[in-house]
Amino acid sequence: MSAATARHILVKTREEAENIKKQIEGGSGFCELAKKLSKCPSGNKGGDLGSFSPGQMVKEFDQVVFNEEVNKVHGPVQTQFGFHLIKITSRD
């Protein structure tokens, strides 16, 4: 596996992440919610993190991106930065 692309939404609490995930499951757009609610600068780009290889992100993030189903929202995933909802957009 050489690279993946993903979007994410970063918030401070598990509860916030779970509430946002429910909104997405209810039909709200991932990109729009990332722009509105994410604490990461990538939120301005709809949570887009671009392309990255294994080892470029924190371990917990990599484990999801390089092992879980593409085009599905995963999480909340806890890292040192907070709680993430992760949408894997592609993986080679």
What are these regions (language model features)?
Residues 1-10, 37, 60-92:
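Proteostasis/folding factors centered on peptidyl-prolyl cis-trans isomerases
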Residues 23-60:
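Peptidyl-prolyl cis-trans isomerase
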